[in-house]
Amino acid sequence: MKFIVHTDGGARDNPGPAAVGVVIEMINENNKKVEISKRIGEATNNVAEYTAVREALAYLRNYLPRSGIPLRGTIIQFYLDSNLVVQQLNGMFKVKDAKLRELMMQVKILESEIGG
């Protein structure tokens, strides 16, 4: 099973009122799409970007076992527009901000629970 995940997050005035959006496309015979949008309160753009990735992984971590889809062997392909988040998650940039470090750890835990 393959999932294509698009995430985005943003804050007005940075920091300011922030929200995240996620679209998860399940590539199979049904090609089901799931959309998640959520206000996350006051945050920076970078916090919102990380939160969107976390929300997508949390959804998949809960969805996969309930659907009988094995966690291991499932392909999850992410698309996001935050170079900072991509580079930090891939270990290319250091995570200096404490809040971003906390969010990155949450993302890494979810990845390991899914089998990534």
Question: How would you name each of these model-derived features?
Answer:
Residues 1-47, 51, 58-62:
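RNase H-like nuclease fold core
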